[in-house]
């Protein structure tokens, strides 16, 4: 079968949609953010490995015009098309499918993503989509669906059909080692990257799902844990991950790997020890840099920080979310501010760079409380600052289906119609708040302009890679500051 894996291009008032591999969607002015869609890339890989003809076409991150995109898609002439969707753009995707179905009624369309995993029948009612795949392992489900449509195998679980039927609750793949390594050439790996990563960079998933010292992640704002992973966490084996890293280094000259799993693999100390041993065995330590998402409470154990540094980790992306314990409790974060501060400082003590992520605009936080978040963010940013440290700030969003969405409905927190989906992606508050959330986002981003941060970042630059990193970061910062200017 001829299958296309696509992201149709569109923008909003000149801003770029951050759709691929993104837990929180916004439109941004920053052109430096091109996140590699790992599950979509895996879907393309599995289909090709099973003998299907595959077109991978990311019109957003390739910065294609609609005409260029349509020409490439029509030249390929797919029989089946997969789109990843998300709540702020789902109406655009419904309209896209309607338009394309008029042109070619025989071409079949599949929607996957976090929103349709919660609300699969909604897309059937609002568009002529042929199939909706639910759950996070939609790469595996799509491969099985295509085989089924060709008369091979059984219907995968979690698929909704045009006739109103479905195949039941989705299932997750128990052993992620059984999946193929992503075909990087098919999926144009080289076009992706972010300002804070050294070049050439590549993305991987060491697993799927979040976990910390106190159990699986259940943050009430996190749509992926609830829509995709059933509040579970799975890891590939260390040997399997190291073999993929070796391929990326030897075949593509990759200098930095980013693990975009929700909390990386850092919550499992035994896994990290074996990972270090495998990296050493394959003679990869010192030949590639690794960065990762992480939870700060996993870094309270200084031995974990030591292992990370010795293995070649450079930067950790860590969620602070708020500088107030009451907010962390409401969010289900299962940690305290003092633990986050200690974990971040432990990492920096071992020479690891840290990106701290923050959210503002909670309905229950006052100016005093958001100022406390600002002060904690400032403290962490300026603590042992080195080239590569940074932070990011966003306005809290509560996507339909998440526990926070249900909280907002129950407490009348919404400042918009909660079903006015497009407003979830405009970098503006959707929840009532006693503070000016846009102003505070802008203020927190501008901590990068603090003279101490600038001086320490410049003085700690050691090579051309660091200089390029600083340049890209400054360029990206201007876009982010612009996002939150009224």
Where does each model-flagged region fall?
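Radical SAM [4Fe-4S] cluster-binding motif and immediate context
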Residues: 181-354, 362, 375
């Amino acid at each position: 079968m001829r299958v296309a894996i696509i992201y149709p291009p569109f923008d909003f008032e000149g801003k770029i949609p951050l759709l691929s591999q993104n837990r929180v969607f916004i439109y941004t002015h920053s052109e430096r953010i091109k996140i590699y869609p790992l599950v979509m890339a895996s879907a393309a890989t599995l289909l090709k490995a099973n003998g299907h003809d595959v077109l991978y076409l990311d019109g957003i991150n390739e910065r294609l015009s609609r005409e260029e995109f349509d020409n490439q898609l029509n030249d390929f002439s797919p029989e089946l098309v997969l789109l990843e969707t998300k709540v702020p753009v789902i109406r655009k995707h419904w309209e896209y499918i309607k338009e394309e179905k008029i042109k070619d009624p025989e071409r079949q369309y599949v929607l996957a993503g976090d929103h349709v995993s919660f609300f699969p029948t909604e897309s059937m009612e609002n568009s002529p989509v042929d199939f909706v795949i639910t759950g996070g392992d939609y790469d595996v489900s799509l491969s099985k669906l295509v085989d089924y449509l060709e008369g091979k195998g059984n219907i995968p679980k979690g698929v909704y059909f045009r006739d109103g039927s479905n195949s039941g609750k989705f299932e997750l793949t128990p052993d992620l080692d059984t999946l193929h390594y992503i075909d990087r050439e098919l999926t144009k790996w080289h076009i992706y990257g972010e300002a804070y990563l050294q070049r050439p960079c590549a993305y991987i998933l060491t697993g799927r799902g979040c976990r910390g010292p106190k159990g699986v992640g259940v943050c009430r704002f996190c749509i992926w844990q609830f829509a995709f992973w059933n509040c579970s966490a799975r890891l590939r084996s260390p040997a399997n991950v190291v073999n993929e890293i070796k391929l990326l280094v030897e075949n593509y000259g990759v200098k930095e790997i980013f693990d975009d799993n929700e909390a990386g693999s850092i919550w499992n100390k035994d896994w990290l020890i074996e990972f270090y041993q495998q990296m050493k065995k394959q003679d990869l330590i010192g030949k590639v840099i690794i960065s990762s998402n992480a939870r700060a409470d996993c870094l309270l154990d200084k031995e974990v920080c030591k292992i990370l540094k010795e293995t070649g980790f450079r930067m950790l992306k860590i969620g602070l979310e708020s500088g107030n314990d009451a907010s962390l409790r409401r969010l289900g974060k299962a940690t305290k501010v003092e633990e986050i501060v200690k974990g971040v400082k432990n990492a920096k003590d071992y020479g690891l760079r840290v990106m701290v992520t923050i959210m503002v605009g909670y309905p229950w936080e006052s100016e005093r409380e958001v100022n406390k978040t600002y002060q904690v963010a400032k403290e962490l940013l300026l603590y042992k600052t080195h080239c590569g440290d940074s932070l990011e700030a966003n306005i809290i969003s509560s996507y339909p289906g998440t526990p926070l969405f249900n909280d907002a409905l129950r407490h009348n927190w919404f400042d918009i119609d909660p079903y006015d989906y497009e407003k979830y992606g405009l970098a503006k508050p959707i929840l009532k708040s006693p503070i000016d959330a846009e102003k505070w986002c802008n203020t927190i981003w501008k901590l990068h302009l603090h003279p101490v941060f600038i001086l320490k970042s410049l003085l700690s630059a050691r090579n051309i890679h660091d200089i390029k990193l600083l340049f890209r970061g400054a360029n990206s910062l201007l876009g982010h500051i612009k996002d939150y200017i009224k």
